[in-house]
């Protein structure tokens, strides 16, 4: 009786649609064949070293030479005690037996790797699962199909760590919440990875809450954990708490670095140098980046005494060689890449004011780009003028584009800056079109029409499209001032870019064109046809066209427009419509 029950249970796993009691004789035969094939493959895997050769003979016994998930799961159960063999067979089956694992098979093979301590292999197997499915599906399926709690905890920790290292802390927190509900604790490595991800995104409060959970779960903090906690405390300005932490015997170069940068940001340079001397006594070295931060803060606060002190230290540590031009260039460019524009600008000015040192052309470009990114527009303008005056050749076009973007970002830009923007654009360096549109709209709102026209003219020949609001304001201005030729040029530009304007702006153009009587009727018809093409018409558009066509005695065209208006359901109010009909008499 027991044997019969086992066979039935096995065959049920292999069956896709029918139960043993209702399946045909041929179905039973197929199930028995699959049972024997699974057992044969398991025996070969467990008993043969060169099992790949022997499996070639079994391949033909599989339906269409394809391994299915139920057969694989049976093999996995029988070979689980030899995890490396099971995992190698999994890879072999995908390559040679057309095996396409379902979520259950994937989860079970990950569990085999995790429970046997093959974490790198488990991580590799997890990656495609995590990359192609949602967090809820991944953790839900793992919870459903894993048989052991320990292996589930290990595998979910790997999932959490994967998300954290990818910078997706939201997904990492979702996995963490799921594990808490299951009363599972992530590994120390997973905790540290998620902490690091939260710190990187400046989520300090959440990070401290996570650390509290880590302590409650009995996870012992390691050096990386303490470094991250010290960094959080320093970012929050809680340097005294960091010193209390250090009094317990916890200290590292990273903790000292965080403290130095914390004091430096607050302008407490005496404390900075005291810490640096303490580090020297303990044979701990600050990095170039940390010295760069201190120098940048000293330059930002204009503390000449400490600027000289930091420079002397950097010379002593061989980070800076004040007389070497090539070294200066590299240092300035490195500081620019770090975003330390006050320090890089100070060294840049020193080099420019000296007679013996000549900077590379690329250094001017780096300086222009860094100042522009930090929204220090006035200083960026000075560097740009210096580049033009000295005839410097900057090959990196992104430097000029970043400068143009900075000029667009400046809400209180002067006329000089607006002229510079036009100059940069004419040289072929076009900023972000969204920002450019905002500048144009701002000029129009402030009624600085000449500046707006200059800006528009500078990009008219380029493949640049302003948004409809900015162009609409300028179009209405052209119509009010009678500059219909410019209005038509702008329309052609928009048409070429397959853009559109607000219907009110188009109506203003139609109205002005029709007021010219017969002179510009054809132009009005062309504009109107484009309006219909882009579905930017309303009742007023048709009214303007019909009245204008009636005035120039184009009665057939007027009637066609009238009929089209009615067909589209754009009939105006009764008073306007009666006035419109009078034009046909």
UniProtKB/Swiss-Prot annotation:
Keywords of this entry: Repeat
One GO location term (cellular component): plastid
Matching PROSITE patterns: PPR
Domain of life: Eukaryota
The PPR repeat ranges on this chain: 152-186, 187-221, 222-247, 252-286, 287-321, 324-358, 360-394, 396-431, 432-466, 467-501, 502-534, 538-572
Protein name (record): Pentatricopeptide repeat-containing protein At4g21170
Family that this chain belongs to: Belongs to the PPR family. P subfamily.
NCBIfam families attached to this UniProt entry: PPR
A Pfam family hit: PPR
InterPro entries: Pentatricopeptide_rpt (IPR002885), PPR-containing_protein (IPR050667), TPR-like_helical_dom_sf (IPR011990)
